[in-house]
Amino acid sequence: MQFLERHFSVLFPVLFFFSFYPISFAPNFDWSTYVSLHYPLTLPNHLALMSSYTHQSHCGTSVFHQAQTLVHLHT
């Protein structure tokens, strides 16, 4: 748990990338539809969320809980 909270700012972009990974090599894949359906937040919004989570982690907020919340919003 401590490891996740300490390394969240590094792990989150990696997990975000691998959430696209399995489907990205499908032939004739419509990226725009996938992104609009599964990732309604734009990349700048994701970056803003990540920076706010990182900032809050220094203020003692549970980043792991926020990560679970974000994953729940995407599913």
Curated annotation (Swiss-Prot):
It is found in: Secreted. It comes from the Eukaryota. The keyword Signal applies. Residues 1-26 form the signal peptide. One of its GO terms (cellular component) is extracellular region. Its main location: secreted. Keywords: Secreted, Signal. This is Uncharacterized protein SPBC713.14c. It comes from Schizosaccharomyces pombe (strain 972 / ATCC 24843) (Fission yeast).
